[in-house]
Amino acid sequence: RANLLYTLGRNHKVSITSFFTAENIKGHDQRGVATYKKDPLANPQALTRNYLGIGLESRFLEEKLTNILSLKHFYSRAEVADISVDQIMKGQKLSHFTKPGFGNAIRYEILPVLSVSANYEYTVRLPDSEEIFGNFISIISNAEIRPETSHNINVGTRYKSSAASHFPITAEINGFYRQTSDRIFLGVLNQSKSAYMNLLSTTTKGLEAEVNYSPLKTLTVFVNGAWQDTRLRKTDEGGKISSRYIGARVPNMPWLYANMGLNYILPAHIVKTDRISFFYTFNYVHDFLLSWEVDGVRSSKATIPQQLIHSAGIGYRFPGEKLTLSAECRNISNERAYDNYLVQKPGRSAFLKLRLFLGD
């Protein structure tokens, strides 16, 4: 990763960002030999991705108006085992994509504590390694998967209390609209195998909000939540999704969720040179359907149930601020938690983490 920032006078600055990743997979896949009669790893598989972005930030009207113009370039190159949907290995395939992106964001400060913003971007999401290579167990590779592209529009407003406030509060609400093509979707091939595919073109509209509040210097409370409605816009070229689903909500996607939590730090007169903190989080996910809502009776459908998860922990920062130790218990009440496709997550679990900061 590389970042470069150059200032052009008082009100303008240019930023350049580059992010490069490379992955290589070598070895022997004995399970693959049994399934496909050939070893998917007989030839090394590789994925190279690069993102390059250039941004121009400008300030006008005594710095009340900020505009950020951005240009982006996305590149991907993959060498992957070519396995058909009927699980026949056809050899090795090379794919590469080069796609542009661009956007503009504008923010206006109405008052020192209140601002409004809007932005548009045309962006690309390159497939990651699992979406291309699979996991070599239940998800097979897809050598023909394409990047997602989307037109995104966001509008919002933000309030942040003044620095002199005794009870700092920040509140933000945003609305968004997204039109996505070549949406990457995990499709089921049979009872034991799945593959990531470009199945859907969709539209998504939604709202998200967040509030952070500090009633005490040592206590911070936050609440956030989001609602989103993702609908099928048109069917894929392969005909894997029937046109009768156009306009229906895309299944297997959470559409309403929220989080809240707090963080409390023991006051300085209790702990002098070190720091002890306590934290608590609550996560809520509304129930959502595993299959298309227009098929059959809702009461007979597989549903990912509502989830209510409580977690808490304690952190200790040693004197010198370079060593921290934290302990956390997730899902304290041992509720049933699920991922997409009704895959159950771990129940109550405990974690201990030690972090050492090197350098100044």
Question: Where are each of the predicted segments found?
Answer:
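Transmembrane beta-strands of outer-membrane beta-barrel proteins
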Residues: 12-18, 65-71, 116-118, 169-173, ...
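Face-selective signature of the C-terminal outer-membrane beta-barrel domain
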Residues: 1-93, 97-112, 119-121, 163-177, ...
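Outer-membrane beta-barrel translocator domains and adjoining extracellular loop/strand segments
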Residues: 26-35, 79-87, 129-136, 183-192, ...
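Extracellular loop and loop/strand-boundary signature of outer-membrane beta-barrel proteins
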Residues: 1-3, 33-44, 83-93, 137-145, ...
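C-terminal beta-signal and adjacent terminal beta-strands/loops
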Residues: 124, 278, 283-297, 303-305, ...
